[in-house]
């Protein structure tokens, strides 16, 4: 935690200057990360327990394990999905940024932290990218942990009637 807090503290002036876009991006990004997982798994015919296991894939394993208990999913599948998400994000993040021409370390870091909890990969870009990745990781985990257990009982009956 201290390893993530110190770089964030050093970038606090930058974070303060963009706090509104950070909050908006966190809510939209967390919703899309979970929503796309839910939709694709459902579209492919996955059972409710599998869909519920994949929903928290973009947050850290300890948080995902607790969240998946409220969705009725499998803890081991959720942990595997989290690991795969992190690995894929770390592997393809740099390529995606090059293809899209993203050079701003704040954006690169925040995107890696939000979507793939790839903090180490973000630190390879810069300390600023790592700080923003750590911030995104924490905020996305918080939003997902608070929202998904509350929203799942509303979403699940719609996707899996009867």
Which positions does each model-derived feature cover?
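Hydrophobic transmembrane alpha-helices of secondary-active transporters
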Residues: 1-15, 62
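Hydrophobic alpha-helical transmembrane segments of integral membrane proteins
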Residues: 3-4, 109, 145-146
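Entry/N-cap segments of selected transmembrane alpha helices
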Residues: 12-38, 79-88, 136-142
């Amino acid at each position: 935690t201290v390893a993530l807090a110190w770089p964030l503290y050093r970038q606090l002036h930058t974070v303060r200057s963009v706090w509104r876009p950070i909050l908006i991006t966190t809510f939209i990004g967390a919703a899309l990360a979970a929503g796309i997982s839910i939709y694709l798994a459902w579209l492919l015919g996955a059972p409710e327990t599998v869909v519920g296991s994949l929903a928290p894939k973009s947050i850290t394993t300890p948080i995902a394990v607790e969240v998946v208990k409220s969705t009725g999913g499998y803890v081991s599948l959720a942990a595997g999905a989290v690991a795969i998400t992190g690995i894929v994000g770390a592997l393809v993040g740099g390529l995606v940024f090059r293809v899209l021409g993203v050079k701003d370390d704040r954006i690169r870091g925040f995107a890696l932290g939000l979507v793939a909890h790839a903090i180490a990969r973000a630190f390879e870009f810069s300390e600023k990218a790592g700080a923003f990745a750590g911030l995104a990781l924490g905020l996305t985990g918080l939003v997902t942990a608070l929202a998904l257990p509350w929203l799942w009982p509303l979403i699940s009956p719609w996707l899996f009637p009867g």
